[in-house]
Amino acid sequence: MNNLSTIQKKLLSIKPFLVTKYHVSELGLFGSVVRDDFSPMSDIDIMVDFSRPVGIEFIDLADELERQLDRKVDLVSRKGIKPKYFDAIQPEIIYV
């Protein structure tokens, strides 16, 4: 996956599966993938929220996303982001 549009389309196509298997309620792209500095070496920054508490499923979800997107994924939980960091990334988040 090498551009925002392609990544968005892929995430939209697999979102029903992610909702069912991993209890995903929200996915948001941020970081270099939504800015002009995304490169072949960049990872994909994804913020996720869940409809119920998860444990090891978080790691399984990260692995699944890396497999589906064929690129390293930096997955962060919405609830795990400190407010000052969320405030910094919020303007650039693109929800899928």
Give the residues covered by each predicted segment.
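Short beta-strand->loop micro-motif that forms the acidic, two-metal-ion catalytic signature
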Residues: 45-47
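Catalytic core of pol beta-like nucleotidyltransferases
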Residues: 1-26, 34-36, 40, 51-96
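Conserved histidines in hydrophobic membrane contexts and catalytic metal-binding motifs
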Residues: 29
